[in-house]
Amino acid sequence: MPTLGVNIDHIATIRQARRTVEPDPVAAAVLAELAGADGITVHLREDRRHIQDRDVRILRQTVRSHLNLEMAATEEMLAIALDIKPDYVTLVPEKREEVTTEGGLDIIGQIARIGEIVDKLQSASIPVSLFIDAEPAQIEASVKVQAQFIELHTGQYAEAKDETNRHRELAILAKGCQQAIQAGLRVNAGHGLTYWNVYPVAALPGMEELNIGHTIISRAALVGIERAVREMKQAIRGNGA
């Protein structure tokens, strides 16, 4: 079964709603790890709508599992990553007007630029993952830029309105996962996964890690983050929430 990366962005969302100091994402990360999180994920957005630079710097010093920094492919974010040196970076698309990441990164349309950023990060011993849709051409492009990982965008699967569409989207993810592994890429997945839909994705052969945030933080508001993380670990194993 894949490991669990807990995205704590929405702890920071609650904090930033009042521009105060709590809840602290750093404290949330500690509790998540104590409950069994295998990694901590944060997205430092260009508009700093939730996670702040301070959070990433302190998390780099305190996270005991691994820190996955999601970021846009910009010079500003590249400089921050090279300075902080997270355990790995996931390059994601980003629009200021979006509520959350809306789709996968277009590697094909900016292959030279992405390749340059991947090279600079990996030359600094920072592994790179590319958040992409499970499209054959995007997977091929990810190989060309020499990324070590991809993270398959599971949004279409998660948002499927019926079982027929859900099975179709799962088949697309399965095919993409297989293609990527055969090409030498390591495969993670995430976006929109919940306690109720995570297991079929977790069961895909070769899947290494699932990055999950909103559903865990939503559950944590009711039962606490430690229980919410433990329940997600169970769901990944097919034991339900």
From Swiss-Prot:
The record marks E151 as: Transition state stabilizer. It comes from the Bacteria. 1-deoxy-D-xylulose 5-phosphate binds at D9, H10, R45, H50, T100. The keyword Transferase applies. The active site is at H43, E70, H191. GO terms for biological process: pyridoxine biosynthetic process. It is found in: Cytoplasm. InterPro entries: Aldolase_TIM, PyrdxlP_synth_PdxJ, Pyridoxine-5'_phos_synth. Pathway: Cofactor biosynthesis; pyridoxine 5'-phosphate biosynthesis; pyridoxine 5'-phosphate from D-erythrose 4-phosphate: step 5/5. The keyword Repressor does not apply. GO terms for cellular component: cytosol. It holds the Pfam family PdxJ. It catalyses: 3-amino-2-oxopropyl phosphate + 1-deoxy-D-xylulose 5-phosphate = pyridoxine 5'-phosphate + phosphate + 2 H2O + H(+). Its EC number is 2.6.99.2. GO terms for molecular function: pyridoxine 5'-phosphate synthase activity. Keywords: Cytoplasm, Pyridoxine biosynthesis, Transferase. 3-amino-2-oxopropyl phosphate binds at N7, R18, G192, G213, H214. HAMAP family: PdxJ. Catalyzes the complicated ring closure reaction between the two acyclic compounds 1-deoxy-D-xylulose-5-phosphate (DXP) and 3-amino-2-oxopropyl phosphate (1-amino-acetone-3-phosphate or AAP) to form pyridoxine 5'-phosphate (PNP) and inorganic phosphate. Belongs to the PNP synthase family. Homooctamer; tetramer of dimers. This is Pyridoxine 5'-phosphate synthase. It comes from Nostoc punctiforme (strain ATCC 29133 / PCC 73102).
